[in-house]
Amino acid sequence: MLFNSFIFLFAFLPVALLTHWLVERFRPEWRLPLLVLLSFVFYGYWDWRFVPLLLASVLVNWLIAQAFLASKCSGLVTVAIVVNLAVLAVFKYFNFFADFANLIPGLHAPKFDIALPLGISFFTFHHIMYLTDLRAGKAPRYGLVRYALYIAFFPQVLAGPLVRWSEIMHQLDERPYQRHDAAERFARGLMLLVAGLAKKVFIGDQLAEYVNPIFQAADAGKAVTMIEAWQATLGFTFQIYFDFSGYTDMALGLALLFGIVLPQNFDVPYRSVSLQDFWRRWHMTLSRFLRDYLYIALGGNRRGLALQLVALFTTMALGGLWHGAGLTFVVWGAAHGLGLCAGVLWRKAGLSMPNLVGWVLTFIFVMLTWVLFRATTFEGALRIYEGLFGFGGFGAGFKWRAIAAAAAVAMIGPTAWAFVHKLPARRWIAVAFAVLFVIVLFKIGDDANYEFIYFQF
């Protein structure tokens, strides 16, 4: 059930909103159980076989949290984190490591054809955040229903944002439709939903048509011309931004419809003037998780420059692996780790750089490394890189209009959250968004309905 599908927009969402409004008004004590039920129904629509996994994940981690609070045995939390990561590894990385093992002569590690449960990378990290903070004495005890909603809340369960317990739990005590600004918040939630849909459908999916065939050809071993390579590389640079930020806008808008404010995930990342600045603006909740729960745990910047660089490189390489079970993702993360390490050394040396130069270098670096992220093989990435430098011929037919329009919106415009929340309460604005929604629906009906890129992670 994609956020940009008719069954979600015209069946699940209206029923969910109506029942939520009725319960919030007449039986507020049922509100949280209802949201949990809706979240599991939403998750089960994708593949009901993984509902028991999500249920077990919630129940086991909650029971371990209760056991820790009763015994104060920190080893329980350590075991829980290891088990969570082990479950993630079995589903996501088993065949990846089996391929490595089979490189050893005489060893024949088995491989299994198992589907990846949607959202497992995200709800695993949610468990880790809560349990780690619980052990540190920062997180309080929560009941099973509240904890289940924190983990499985349907706008965030599939692809984030990664939400800290401290950002959402206190909101569950509110009666959102009784607030003085309830109507305004609901309206802005609808506008965010429409804005995210428009970004995904009009820009992200449009660019996918120019990007996917070229990367598929490269992965198949075909030569790529310079025009094709630049079109695919630039196109994917903006496709992934509008696809993922569009999803995030929709998730934030949907959550707002149910009275919950989720953290923002993007802050105009392609205006960054350094790689460090980029990771403060791109997938901000993941960057925050990697910093607080991995980089600092590895020593951070507290144990000297050498260990800081090792911790930074390791964090980014593992961050790349988190995105996918493939060496291309690891190398993508490692490349960003090396880039961030270079930035640390640059600043330690007391050097500076004009913002314009920093922006150009950062954009080029990010753009070139996206090739590794998008290509499914190193051979495919190499074909794209060869094409970028003209080894596959020049070519023709560069789709510059769509890419230029996407670049302008990505670099000049504000975030959808900032834009929507700055709009005055005017009837014509509501009408404009309603018209935009109708146009989006026609577009969805006419064209291919692409899944969100980050659903595969």
Predicted features and spans:
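Membrane-embedded transmembrane alpha-helical bundles that form the catalytic cores
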Residues: M1-A406, A418-Q456
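Hydrophobic, aromatic-rich transmembrane alpha-helices
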Residues: A407-T415
